[in-house]
Amino acid sequence: ADVLLVGDERVYEFITHLLAEIRRTFRSRKIHIGMDEAFGLGRGAYLDLHGYHPQLEIMKQHLERVLSICKTLEIEPMVWSDMLINASHGKGTGMANYYNTDHPILPEAHDAFPRDLTQVFWDYNHHEASTYEAIIARHKIFTDRVVFAGACWNWNSFTTDYDKTFLITKPALQACKRSGVRDVFMTTWGDNGVEGSLLETLLGAQLFAEYGYADEVDDARLRARFLTCTGCNYDDFRAMTY
């Protein structure tokens, strides 16, 4: 079981305690509340208890409760957007549907989620800026607050895959600039056999940082800035690609 039971009061008691502890621990009021890849939403025990309900309806119900808790605790939430986008067209969950901008939006989905909710568009795979721009445009149907999450590919390998990282990051951040997305962050992940150190991803962080100051970032600029900021050698990190 990897999906919380929507509607069960024990779930919201747990979430309240969880968020309250985070609120006490950190100074920031911005908290990422996740909700991604909940492919089993509305199935399993929920289906046994309540019968079939569309995922859009269930997601809306759950999100309203969690946002109410966040408001009480004076937390500013952001949420992964994949389940919201997938629920909005009703074509099914999964990454292929998340990134498919040809699916028509259900009429009832246009106002299903608060427009002031920050939705985090995550994409670690596409190579064309136009693809990112199209998906960002779809997000803006639902919210004025879009954040982009890219990645430094430190998983699925013995070391960080900088060839892939550079291939996806440059078009993604260029698309964000053209689309007016001002907030971005770089993810790293520990699943699927990651064996390297997080320190290996420093060059990826430098790449993201430099796009905050320039429309184009070439290797010469990145090499110089990386040495200045970290004391590390650009070529050594690029050579780690496996």
Predicted ranges, named:
Residues 1-6, 39:
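Catalytic core of soluble alpha/beta enzymes
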Residues 9-24, 28-31, 37, 48-242:
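Substrate-binding groove of N-acetylhexosamine-processing glycoside hydrolases
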Residues 39-45:
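Short acidic/His/Gly/Ser-rich catalytic and metal-binding motifs that mark active-site loops
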